Amino acid sequence: MDTQALALALPLIGWASHTALLTHRLATARRDPLTGLRTRAGWTALAERSIRRHRDAVVLLLDLDDFKNLNDTHGHAAGDFALVVTAERLAAWCGRNGIAGRLGGDEFVAIARQAPDLDLDLESLRRALNQPVAYAGRRLPVSVSVGSCHVKDLPVRSLSDALATADSAMYAAKGTSGRRGPRTLNR
């Protein structure tokens, strides 16, 4: 290859490498490295599209109960393992009709198309998420408070309103003596 051809090819090779690197970084930024779920940014774009397409969407906000205690008692590796298992259980529940994400820390989010028996589905989610986690020969207690919002019941279908309503429902669930129960609130 002569020097003139090399001089022409080098910038193209540089741009191709740079584009590949940016594509990889963008994909990585949209996936949580610990759980593999979508990050807030990756989840939000898909959730907004889902709300526009599916009037029957349900937004869920989930928070692990007493997660700090689990971390302090059993160690951060055990806490990370509990987060990964929770993410797997949530993703399995969402299946093909929903999208799960991790907002950060011990908070998760999901959007799903409403099934005719959604209350039963929320109960099955609660049961699945509140199962102990087997870690290093121990059974770690895991419980999750779940808040939900039926988008069709909002005056204006928006993701921000649905998340705010699901957040209120989640804290109402945390405030109950039993916790661990799904709550649905709508304005």
What does each model-identified segment do?
Residues 43, 47, 82-83, 87-90, ...:
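Heptad-repeat coiled-coil signal-transmission/dimerization helices
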